[in-house]
Structure formats: structure tokens, C-alpha cells
A protein has these predicted regions:
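S-adenosylmethionine
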Residues: 39, 74-76, 80-217
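SAM-dependent Rossmann-like transferase core, predominantly class I methyltransferases
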Residues: 2-73, 82-89, 112
Length: 217
């Protein structure tokens, strides 16, 4: 049998940093670089005992919310996604990892359902693929939900919205960790007054940024 589906869909299983997650066609296959930064306790991130609240935007399968719960054992996690179908997958993963008491799953558009809530840490792996790249996806990527990839003409429409709203939802010493793919040059040109920190991972250079609340102008 020949198929262009990702192997993770056929097996209903994907791993980040060795941690297993259930996946199917309702979510993209998780492959975020943020997982490594959480697992290794990157030096710029707050200490585990300093984080009591984490927000995971565009949670998809819930993998980053769950990894955050492991990395920050005292924290309550809020995981938001626009897709009710994706949240059903996340709910299964949260239950399988025994995190139902610590991770709240919320349906909504980015910060919209959160009111005035503030968080010590915001994580997000939002859609960031530009329109041209989405149009030329190979078959295995076309099997994934396009809503989880498509970031507008230059790929950064949703990232810009996150930057615009993040400060209002960060606690005084809070920060945001956001994956953006290859859009670093565009983003730095758009925000010349913001000093982005671009941590590298084993498989990426300059594809994730870190900003503290004080970095926002």
C-alpha cells in the first residue's frame, strides 16, 4: 500500500524529546524546536520554581503544554487553540499524561478568550508558513490541517498578532517563547526597536525568539 500520509498518522504516535503523543489528521505532526529548550532548561528561561502560570497558544495536540507541565511542576497551564478538533486530540494527550488537573484547554482565537489573565511564561508554535510555500507543499504536508501551517503572505500574520497582544498578558517578569520558522529577517525589520533573543537548538538557528515583558516597547 502506498500512502503520502506522515508515518505519525499511520501509527497515531509522535515524539518530542522522547515524550510520546497521540496524533491524527486533526492536528499537525508535532516537531517544535521549543521542546528542546524546555527539556534542557535553557538558561534564559525562568527557573522552574519561578513559574506558576504558563500559556500555550496554538496548542494543537497539546504537546508543548504537556512538556511545559513537566518542566514547570508548580505551574498551571492554559492551552488555547482555535480548532475544536485539535483540542479533542489535546484532551486525549492531556489525559494520557495524567495532566487533566493542571492543564486547562480553551477554544478561542489567541488571547481573545483570556480576559485580563497574565502568565509567567507564554509558549507558542503558531502557523508561520508563507502562502507560496503552503501552495507548493509536498503530499505529506498537504495531509496536515492547513490552518495549522498557513501564516499569510509572508508567514508572519499570526506572529505579529501574538507580539501585539503578549505584553498585556505577561506577568512583570514574564516572557514569551515563539517559533517562527525562517522569518527572522522580516520580523527584525518590522520591529527594529525590539531586541529579540534568538536561541539556537540542535536542529535550528534563529527560528525561535525569546522576549521578556521589558523587551516590548
Amino acid at each position: 500500500i502506498t500512502t503520502c500520509k506522515p508515518a505519525s498518522y499511520l501509527l497515531n504516535k509522535a515524539y518530542i524529546q522522547g515524550v510520546p503523543f497521540y496524533v491524527d489528521e486533526r492536528v499537525i505532526v508535532p516537531r517544535s524546536y521549543i521542546g528542546e529548550l524546555l527539556a534542557t532548561g535553557a538558561e534564559f528561561l525562568p527557573a522552574p520554581d519561578a513559574v506558576r502560570s504558563v500559556l500555550d497558544l496554538c496548542t494543537g495536540s497539546g504537546c508543548l503544554a504537556i512538556l511545559a507541565a513537566y518542566a514547570y511542576p508548580e505551574a498551571e497551564i492554559c492551552a488555547v487553540d482555535l480548532s475544536a478538533a485539535a483540542l479533542d486530540v489535546a484532551r486525549r494527550n492531556v489525559a494520557e499524561h495524567g495532566m487533566s488537573e493542571r492543564i486547562a484547554l480553551v477554544e478561542g482565537d489567541l488571547f481573545a478568550p483570556l480576559g485580563a489573565r497574565k502568565f509567567d511564561l507564554i509558549l507558542t508554535n503558531p502557523p508561520y508558513v508563507d502562502a507560496e510555500a503552503v501552495a507548493s507543499f509536498p503530499p505529506e504536508y498537504r495531509a496536515e490541517p492547513v490552518i495549522a501551517h498557513a501564516g499569510g503572505k509572508d508567514g508572519l500574520d499570526i506572529v505579529r498578532r501574538i507580539i501585539a497582544g503578549a505584553k498585556a498578558h505577561l506577568a512583570p517578569r514574564g516572557g514569551v517563547l515563539c517559533e517562527i520558522g525562517t522569518g527572522r529577517d522580516i520580523l527584525e525589520a518590522d520591529y527594529p526597536d525590539i531586541a529579540f533573543l534568538w536561541p539556537d537548538t540542535e536542529e535550528s538557528e534563529g527560528e525561535v525568539f525569546w522576549l521578556t515583558r521589558e523587551d516590548f516597547v
